[in-house]
From Swiss-Prot:
PROSITE patterns: HEXAPEP_TRANSFERASES (PS00101). Belongs to the transferase hexapeptide repeat family. DapH subfamily. The lineage of its organism: Bacteria, Bacillati, Bacillota, Bacilli, Lactobacillales. This is 2,3,4,5-tetrahydropyridine-2,6-dicarboxylate N-acetyltransferase. Catalyzes the transfer of an acetyl group from acetyl-CoA to tetrahydrodipicolinate. One of its GO terms (molecular function) is tetrahydrodipicolinate N-acetyltransferase activity. InterPro entries: DapH, DapH_N, Hexapep, Hexapep_transf_CS, Trans_hexapeptide_repeat, Trimer_LpxA-like_sf.
């Protein structure tokens, strides 16, 4: 699925101009005294909508008055991504905001957090608990390890986002600082903190990360992707 590519200023405007909503699901007993407005969806004894539209209905319940409110945000500006038509494997518990691009056969594991404006290429895996900040970009057939962070940039608007190339492996709990670019074919070792651009086809490790060697056949074998994990 390809979302419209947004600049930092466009994302800021999108958030600033968005109608802020506190979306709720309310299960109630009793009868609603008033008409249900168009902004609220009623299915049996369940209401879905913004709290400001739902609350007045609950105030006018008659007979066996009781209800339970479920919510997961307050004055939210950015909805979660509608994942129904995405040609990728997205596991339960991944948090993906709207205006994110996810390529075919990508894999998003449970606990991953992907912010507005991020781009994930075809065949790329975002592992458990990894974080892609706003506008972070990952190319095709890459792997972002569990707990890794690609720092996001929405403000200041002038800053550059993280860009990761194709066929890159970022190890578990590594951190890539704002504006850094990781060249295609490179490997970032687990726990590394990357503060400078990384050229293509090298291995970096350490705090701060430094080049420790060029990619060789042994490294390629150890970091090879498993296509079966990307089969839908």
């Amino acid at each position: 699925m390809t979302a419209q590519k947004m600049t930092a200023q466009e994302i800021i405007a999108f958030i600033g101009n968005a109608v802020k909503k506190t979306t709720v699901k309310v299960t109630f007993e009793g009868e609603l005294a008033g008409a249900v407005p168009a902004e609220v969806t009623k299915l049996g004894n369940v209401l879905f909508g913004d709290w400001k539209d739902v609350e007045p209905l609950l105030a006018n319940l008659t007979e066996n008055v009781d209800y339970v409110v479920e919510q997961d945000g307050r004055n939210s500006a950015v909805p979660l991504l509608d994942k129904r038509n995405i040609n990728a494997r997205i596991e339960p518990g991944a948090i993906i905001r709207d205006q994110v691009t996810i390529g075919d056969n990508a894999v998003i594991m449970m606990g991953a957090v992907i912010n507005i404006g991020a781009e994930i290429g075809p065949g790329t895996m975002i592992d458990m608990g990894a974080i892609l900040g706003g506008r972070a970009t990952v190319g095709k057939n890459s792997h972002i390890g569990a707990g890794a962070v690609l720092a996001g940039v929405i403000e200041p608007a002038s800053a550059e986002p993280v860009r990761v190339g194709d066929n890159v492996l970022v190890g578990a709990n590594a951190v890539v600082i704002e504006g850094v670019q990781i060249g295609s074919g490179s490997v970032v070792a687990a726990g590394a903190i990357v503060t400078q651009d990384v050229p293509e086809n090298v291995v970096v490790a350490g705090v701060p990360a430094r080049i420790i060697k060029e990619i060789d056949a042994q490294t390629q074998q150890k970091t090879a992707l498993e296509e079966a994990l990307r089969t839908l």
